[in-house]
Amino acid sequence: MATTRLLAIAVASGRVGSVFMIGDTLTYWQVSVKAAESPVEAAAHAQTLINGFWPDVIVTEEPNAVRHKGAETLALIAAMARVAEDCDLLDVQVPRVQRFPNKYAEAEALALRYPELAPWKPHKRRFYQAEPRNTVLFEALALADFMLNNRGE
């Protein structure tokens, strides 16, 4: 059986995070601010990633299960999912399951499983600070991890 090439993309306010995995091995990760500017930029970003990595599967957040994202963010997710569909790729939309008390605990657990991302682990913020830029990277990794751990269910 061939090893699955998986591209997971997450969108947060003003940022798009993506991770690329071959099997269970994390090989690439990126945070883009430009991709979050508009659905056109998001689609172009997704197309660039697809052209560069040739994934078998693209994982995005399931829009119907999202309660905490605005209309602009949902439009970005939809634009990237359309690109996957246009490229005849399997676009798996998974719910963003929060298995930890907060994003920082989740990032800590994911950094233990994928130590190559440990330097990008976001630190807990104070209430008056903006959300750390790299949280979206760990959201993308959580989507990929959810997909990998729930195959065949």
Question: Residue spans of the language-model regions?
Answer:
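Phosphate- and other anionic-substrate recognition elements at nucleic-acid/protein interfaces
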Residues: 1-153
